[in-house]
Each structure stands twice: as C-alpha cells, then as structure tokens.
Amino acid sequence: MVIFWKIIGMDCAAAKPVSCSVKRNHDVKYVSTVYDFVTRGLFVLARAQVDYFFDKNGKMTVSASLKKVCPLTDQLPRFGVHAELKSEFENVEYYGRGPLENYSDFKEHSPVGIYKTTVTNMAHKYIKPQDSGNRGEVRYSVVTNQNGAGLRFNALEKYINFNANHFTLEQLKKAGHIEDLPDCDTTFTAIDGFVRGTGSGSCGPIPSREHLISFGYFKPLCFSFEVEPVEDQDKE
C-alpha cells in the first residue's frame, strides 16, 4: 500500500490554494480556505476545506473536511492539520490513550488516562525512521514551554489523534537511519481526525476494513477541534 501511495504521488502531494474568504460577525472572525491536493504533475487527488473561527478571547475553532476527486484515492494514511512551534515548547500533557504510541488496531496496551511527557520522548526510535508516536482517543492535549505558556488542543465532536516531534514529516521521509534524523529548532505538532491502523506492519497484511480511512465524492471526511492559548504561569 505504501508503494501504491508513491505511485499516485500521494506522498509528495502539495496543497494548492483555491479560495480564501474572511467574514466577521460581532466578536467572531471567520476565515474559510479551500485547497486542492495535487501531485507534482498537477493531478488533483482531493479537495480540502479548512474553516477557522476566532473569538475575542483568543480561542480558535478549526473545522476540516476532505472530499475525494481522484478515483484512485480510496485509502489515506491520515487526515489532519499540522502546526509548527519553536523547539522550546517541549512539555506535553494529554488526556487519551498512553503512555506509549498507539493506533486504532494497536491500543490495548495503552489505557485511557492523563499523561505527561516531552516532545523528545513522543516518537518511538525505530532503527529505520518512520511515522510513530501517535496518541489516539485524545480528549485534549497541551504543549508548553518551561514557563508553562503554550497551546491547548481540545477535541470537539469526536476524539482526535495527537503527535509532536522535533522534526518534520519531510525530514522523516528523507532519513535512512535514526542517526540521520536531525533535531531541528521546531516542535512539529499533528492534530489528526483520522489515522490509518498499522495492520501487521511492513511485512504483513494491511489493516482490516474498520481500521482503514475510506472517503468518497459525496461522503467527505470531517473533524473539528479547538485551539486556545495557555498563559505563562510566571506572568503576573
């Protein structure tokens, strides 16, 4: 399946802006964006709409949806929103499955609870660098610096998946060995509404149907979450 993703160019698809509109209603500002995900050959795979609602208290609500355009995009590895912070945002607290990485078909070892860790320790250090460290069924997650300032991500209609690393997915893809993976001046956070199951790994069958991510022309993937600031604990 990974080879199939590469064949159709899903692993290197880029977001091409289609439209952007801004509205204001009393104390709430609304920004709506539409993107096409295209391959290097400008072949459109899917269309995404991401809406942002900002209130006067600094809280942002994000609503994202993805609709199929290409008939080949029957399965996805994940669908979510990423954000980069400075590397000083190292501390993590979350309410979800933990303390180890877990996925929809690989989670019984990780009971639901409130866990504290660091961005450095989120990912599992496999010899061959690969996507890892996902935390599933997350109700909320908080990323802060040493002073306690940062961001809190709250699930809304359904649970979210959360991950954070000091490297980007592009750097992960290029690294051949764990020692090739740079420790960058960034905290790369991932808020995913949908994450594919692991199946039996690279040498076994793909996940069963209930752990795959399927979507269609008239049945888009949809999820939403909130982002709110966490104030510096030393601030008077």
Predicted regions and their residues:
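Beta-strand/loop-rich accessory regions of lumenal/periplasmic or secreted enzymes
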Residues: 1-236
